[in-house]
Amino acid sequence: MSLQMVTVGHNIALIQPGFSLMNFDGQVFFFGQKGWPKRSCPTGVFHFDIKQNHLKLKPAIFSKDSCYLPPLRYPATCSYKGSIDSDKHQYIIHGGKTPNNELSDKIYIMSVACKNNKKVTFRCTEKDLVGDVPEPRYGHSIDVVYSRGKSMGVLFGGRSYMPSTQRTTEKWNSVADCLPHVFLIDFEFGCATSYILPELQDGLSFHVSIARNDTVYILGGHSLASNIRPANLYRIRVDLPLGTPAVNCTVLPGGISVSSAILTQTNNDEFVIVGGYQLENQKRMVCSLVSLGDNTIEISEMETPDWTSDIKHSKIWFGSNMGNGTIFLGIPGDNKQAMSEAFYFYTLRCSEEDLSEDQKIVSNSQTSTEDPGDSTPFEDSEEFCFSAEATSFDGDDEFDTYNEDDEDDESVTGYWITCCPTCDVDINTWVPFYSTELNKPAMIYCSHGDGHWVHAQCMDLEERTLIHLSEGSNKYYCNEHVQIARALQTPKRNPPLQKPPMKSLHKKGSGKVLTPAKKSFLRRLFD
């Protein structure tokens, strides 16, 4: 095993415990950013590009017919194929937490709409469920099983908020284990069915799940009610005949006590479990090798990585599976130093000696993953789980190398110029100021003379003013040239005020005109 430190560009603030990674044809995409998406990347999905131990997050594109996909932390995700032999990969996303700490009960299906010049356009659709709809939750698992030429989703575990009748102001965000029900979900028709299995007595969350053909293995996990991490090992088998599906569960010996572990696949039938927690305040520093057979599973300890002192002394850690036996790890930065980063990141290669040369290039230059996940401090009740499919690994997949020249080189662009004598924008210390900014400062064009660009923040522009100027066609002048521009302008001619004529105060109004008939009547009246 080899451990390498990874540096991150300006988007490091987007990475937080609970994010997910999705792999589409060798390209990995980041999902679950911190906070709500900005205007510069309204989708909240980024290309997760690692080259020479440096990570860049580049905004992804969605088709016009896509639904809105909110950033979700600790969702259950898995890759999905219509059949076990299909080459078309989709990703299923269920549950998770929004930036407002609301829990989602929706199912989203992510797929590739088109791919042009290595630029991927996604399509996201929301699937409505009927039947026994799972309650909103996070920290659970979802896997896909294949039986008799059909496929079905298997959802289990997780945590949810207390029932509305029990939630109070003081305990509004208190969570509890979901009931230990197993849900079968038909992604084609949107039907969900709940199964109660006697072998599953306690609710679990942040466990490890592995799917192989018609079987799902559940390892470890944490029970919030008893605050223990039992050495669980369950085998859930699903049979899909023409009629009603058959679901059975078997308790197997030889489990491990772990929660929030990271799972990566090193071979068709071999997985490595890294990280997680074995006690409330104790990280699990050993690694386990999981070998799957037709009806068997074996778990054994393997070589322990040469952890750095920062990782050893860190109270929490989190990460995700990058694929090809590589794991992405993160630990909190040192808050004692003024210029310390929020997090430090590493890549851990678990099976470098078994990879081909092409796969080694993939591990060095481009992250890859079959299934996502993350962890976070257990004392904050924020753990995560991972799931993987034994049939999803393909060591011979061709990787389409990403062309760095397709992107703009930020070092030669004019974003980091000194726009005015009081400009203090520096590439090393700059942080986003406007909601429209992501990794570059917002600029506006000054129309004085031949014209030049200035930073909107240096001009003290309000965000609504900046948006108004960018949408319209009015000329803008910077603070240094605005007085010169005003002096050169010809003042507009103001038309004279038109005063309404005043009525004469002594003018008598016109009297009433009496007709001859009325005059004759009045004469006879007074005579």
Swiss-Prot record:
Transmembrane segments: none annotated. Residues 361-370 have a biased composition (Polar residues). GO terms for biological process: B cell differentiation; B cell homeostatic proliferation; B cell lineage commitment; defense response to bacterium; DN2 thymocyte differentiation; DNA recombination; mature B cell differentiation involved in immune response; negative regulation of T cell differentiation in thymus. The atypical PHD-type zinc finger recognizes and binds histone H3 trimethylated on 'Lys-4' (H3K4me3). The presence Tyr-445 instead of a carboxylate in classical PHD-type zinc fingers results in an enhanced binding to H3K4me3 in presence of dimethylated on 'Arg-2' (H3R2me2) rather than inhibited. Disruption phenotype: Mice are viable but fail to produce mature B or T-lymphocytes. Very immature lymphoid cells are present in primary lymphoid organs. These cells do not rearrange their immunoglobulin or T-cell receptor loci. Double knockout with TREX1 does not show a visible phenotype. The lineage of its organism: Eukaryota, Metazoa, Chordata, Craniata, Vertebrata. GO terms for molecular function: chromatin binding; DNA binding; histone H3K4me3 reader activity; phosphatidylinositol binding; phosphatidylinositol-3,4,5-trisphosphate binding; phosphatidylinositol-3,4-bisphosphate binding; phosphatidylinositol-3,5-bisphosphate binding; phosphatidylinositol-4,5-bisphosphate binding. CDD domains: PHD_RAG2. Zn(2+) 1 binds at C419, C423, H455, C458. This is V(D)J recombination-activating protein 2. InterPro entries: Gal_Oxase/kelch_b-propeller, Kelch-typ_b-propeller, RAG2, RAG2_PHD, Znf_FYVE_PHD. Residues 371-380 have a biased composition (Acidic residues). The keyword Lipid metabolism does not apply. Maturing lymphoid cells. The keyword Zinc-finger applies. Component of the RAG complex composed of core components RAG1 and RAG2, and associated component HMGB1 or HMGB2. Belongs to the RAG2 family.
